[in-house]
Amino acid sequence: MSPLRRPLQRRLPLPGQRLVTLTALTPLLLLGACAGEDALNTDEPSDDSGGGQVVIGGQNYAEMQIMSEMYKALLAADGFDVKLTLVESRDVYTPEMQDGNVDVSADYLSSMTEFLNKQENGADAETVASPDPEATLEELKKLAEPTGIEPLEPAEAQNANAFAVTREFAEQNDLKTMSDLAELGEPVTLAAAEDCSQRSDCKLGLEEVYGLEISKVEPLGFGTTGTKDALKSGEVDLGQVGTSDATLETEDLVLLEDDKELQNAENLVPMVNSGFLAENPKVADTLNEMSSGLTTEDLADMIGKVDLKRELPEDVAREYLDGKGLI
């Protein structure tokens, strides 16, 4: 740990801070859910019918629970019977959407672009996503079209990869940007996702783009309680979190600005099966209208209600949509 830092006293995590994850469902289970069988964490159809059935897939943690519940409420208001199936990872629900067993999902612009890029061009494919959301969207459209899925309009809201320090450390050393941290010239210990050491947007990029010396990576997870506790206790200097993390202020953690644009654009974007969209073009209007007004601040506020206040994602989603006059 840098000698410029005084460790903070360790505090217990806040009650609602743990992210919810599930063991990934197999495509067979997803297919069964689409065929009408009960599957883990799959909702029953909504009562308001008239537009046919729509299956929403996605990842099972607070942010994506909220996004999926907003999509569900909007499409139910349009007269669809909605089934919601949440799983652990993108590589479970995306193939199901490509096959037409899942109709709609919320995703992250660059992450989805690179998922399809590697699916098409191999694990060593050159990165095509960038910090520019418009350019990245064009790349996503090109990669998605032959797979049978289509991106709609991205929201301003995003949860990009970011790095935080304690407020005390930032104030002691006048840190506002990642370049400020690099200028201290001290080795940095980092708590991050397990694959951070191999990622160009984590350890590799921090060293190459910012010139940081990462002396150790503790694989405590992306934005997890463990990562935040390690920051607060002084075990590490820097922690990998998301830009929409609603707990940072209450934890006395602050984001350092990515002033050299290491991170790619991770705007939230609706992804839709192309065949389903061709049969139901109004879905694009409905989801695009919501995306056009959704900000990162809105998203962080909703995540805080779920993670900190323990409100239900469904209730938080409906409250937001009702407040915006969308349902």
Label every model-predicted segment.
Residues P3-T23:
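Bacterial N-terminal signal peptides that target proteins for export
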Residues A35-D38:
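Bacterial signal peptide processing site
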Residues L86-V102, L109-F115, N121:
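Acidic helix-start/capping segments at beta-turn-to-alpha-helix junctions
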Residues A62, K83-P95, E194, S215-D229:
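Short helix-initiation/N-cap motifs at beta->coil->alpha
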Residues L29-A33:
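C-terminal motif of bacterial Sec signal peptides marking the signal peptidase cleavage site
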